[in-house]
Amino acid sequence: MLAEICEHFVDHAEVFRDGDHVTLSSEIGEAYISKVSEQLDITLACSTEDMLSMTRGIIAEHLFMFAGDDPLTLEWADQPKPEKLANLSEITVVSAENVTPRMRRLTVSCTDTARFDTSEGLHVRLLMPPKGREPIWPVTLADGRIGWPEGEDEIAVRYYTIRSIDLERREMAIDFVVHDDCGRRMPGAEFGLTAQPGDRAALLGPGAGGMPDARDLLLAGDETALPAIARMIELATPEMKIHAIIEVADKAEEQALACAAKDFSIEWLHRNGAEPGTAKLLEPAIAARLETLGPETFVWAACEKTEAQAIRARLKESGLDRTRMSSITYWRRGHTD
């Protein structure tokens, strides 16, 4: 199972293997997994209880997935009690508007917006219940997995970025890329397009995807990463240096982004008719700037899987220290997950 763990998580974390010992390191924490006899010994280290709960759930879900039909027993030293998820917050849609022709923004109300007001975790899992049904929210199971409602109560889950937060009004904005993937159902885009004031949903998080701890940032991504890039740009302080490279469909998708950093620049790349995930514009644009990076520049990129892999390979090839880079898969062409 160690081989499956390494193969799967390489797109989501830094993976290190030394014989029967594997370390997974990401923005939300670290997992140390060792094979001892016929068992796996797992130790998790995260900065917050919410991130620990999220990491435990992710590890548990994947271990059961890798086990398939084989029996698996998973026990934790601090066995979680079956109960409502501690990091779940219900939200209600307040309004919807088009930011650009292909980007739609939902403003939602939430009673505990303050816990999302952090630069350490910009992302959440959006839980979208079936329309017309009273939501049944998931619970924590004793083995660490999340117990999801099934059948007619099944919930669609997708990752999104909190675009902005209004603590006084207890409201948050979430941006949705509006697209159709060759006729495949896209639950997130569908929710963004059809949500009406009063509609209910929920958020799990905040979790992975914090702002890098650096004063010099090279940020790159396609439109799926634009909300995260925009949030980081707007969180910047005056002494920072930021250059952003953003791939979008065309000029109509460009957005005006405010930044307090005195040294700020942005480069828009247009696909001009090419399908998302096929233009391959980001990797060469990043490569063109590698020789001019400062000694403390952190390179952050997020996009379609194949390009994220190409960017990661190019950064490693350039000799950039792994602690100064992050290239993340945000989506996979041909998949709706």
Label each residue range with its predicted role:
Residues M1-D337:
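Extended, composition-driven regions rather than compact fold-specific motifs
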